[in-house]
């Protein structure tokens, strides 16, 4: 019997959308966006994070000033309870997706051998 991988992928998408992890993430995201101050703070954090990632991917050096600014931004958002909770929920969702990716990649790892060693 042939497996339609797209159907399986869409089933997985629906399962993720229905999960407690995603529901919590979405609720926290909505709460942060409903608070104008928190929304601006979170958007600023994301902008700083994105700029640093882009520089890193382009092979550009990140200055000490940028590191200091990023640290200040992280410290600020971590003090905001809802943003901090949102970041924790994002991390949990990222871990879940990482675990799913490991499961999906398992046949290739078994075929070619583990990249890790």
UniProtKB/Swiss-Prot annotation:
Stretch forming the signal peptide: none
A Pfam family annotated for this UniProt entry: Com_YlbF
Q: Which domain of life is it from?
A: Bacteria
Q: Which residues cross the membrane?
A: none
Q: Which InterPro entries match?
A: Com_YlbF, YheA/YmcA-like_dom_sf
The record's similarity note reads: Belongs to the UPF0342 family.
Annotated HAMAP family: UPF0342 (MF_01526)
Protein name per the record: UPF0342 protein YheA
């Amino acid at each position: 019997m042939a497996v339609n991988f797209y159907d399986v992928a869409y089933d997985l998408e629906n399962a993720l959308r229905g999960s407690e992890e995603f529901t919590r993430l979405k609720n926290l995201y909505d709460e942060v966006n409903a608070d104008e101050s928190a929304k601006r703070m979170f958007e600023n954090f994301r902008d700083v994070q994105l700029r640093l990632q882009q520089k890193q991917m382009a092979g550009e050096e990140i200055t000490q000033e940028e590191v200091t600014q990023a640290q200040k931004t992280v410290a600020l958002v971590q003090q905001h309870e809802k943003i901090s909770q949102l970041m924790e929920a994002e991390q949990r969702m990222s871990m879940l997706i990482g675990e799913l990716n490991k499961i999906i990649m398992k046949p290739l790892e078994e075929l070619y051998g583990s990249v890790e060693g």
